[in-house]
Amino acid sequence: MKFGLTAVLLVTSAGAFAQFGPPPGGPPRPAKATAPEDLTGYWVALVTEDWRWRMVTPAKGDYDGVPLNPAGRKLADTWDPAKDEAAGNQCKAYGAAAITRVPGRFHITWQDDNTLKLETDAGTQTRLFHFGGKFPESGDAGWQGYSVASWDHQAGGGFGPPGPGGSLKVVTTHIKPGYLRKNGVPYSANAVVTEYFDAIKEPDGEQYLVVKTLVDDPQYLAGQFITSTHFKKEPDGAKWRPTPCAAR
């Protein structure tokens, strides 16, 4: 019996070694090589919800659907686009907490093996997603903040390896204060933005990108602000039209 148990353990160990490979010791594989899905290319926003807040500038005081606390509502009620324009703050609604809701296009490429770059034609913004990056200790990193990325792989069954597919998870901090909506609905420098990017390929070959965004801001929000935004992949950049930020 002892011999039989030993043999079973040896076979099991050998199988596990073959399945998972040798113990880790070398450098980690770059993020580009371990990507569970291809997010690169041109993507156009599909405005299928929240039309009145995304396609036109809402009226002052229209912050339905955003869990503002009293401080957030008070600040939103003071919105003055002319003051933003005079101060050079036309990009307040194009920051990391809101840019996915701005109608337009994304262009996603790899800047290097561990940095994914997302550009927008609306507002001409650039975001960098750093795999294995560390958040700075202080200071703001501009409208797009500092983003740390990771692959959120699907779990495998039992003791198996991760299953196929997965999401890109991005956590952004150190953001310059801005607007969740163009009519002055605020978020502060303390906001934390967590995003999940998922690519979907339909049987007919059409490809879509779904971005789930969660904004936490203890200064102006009484709860988490959650949105889900959809994009469709385009064959090339023929319709790419960079435009400047607009305050209204």
Locations of the language-model features?
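Cleavable N-terminal signal peptides
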Residues: L5-T6, A16
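PEST-like low-complexity, intrinsically disordered acidic/proline/serine-rich tracts
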Residues: F17-R248
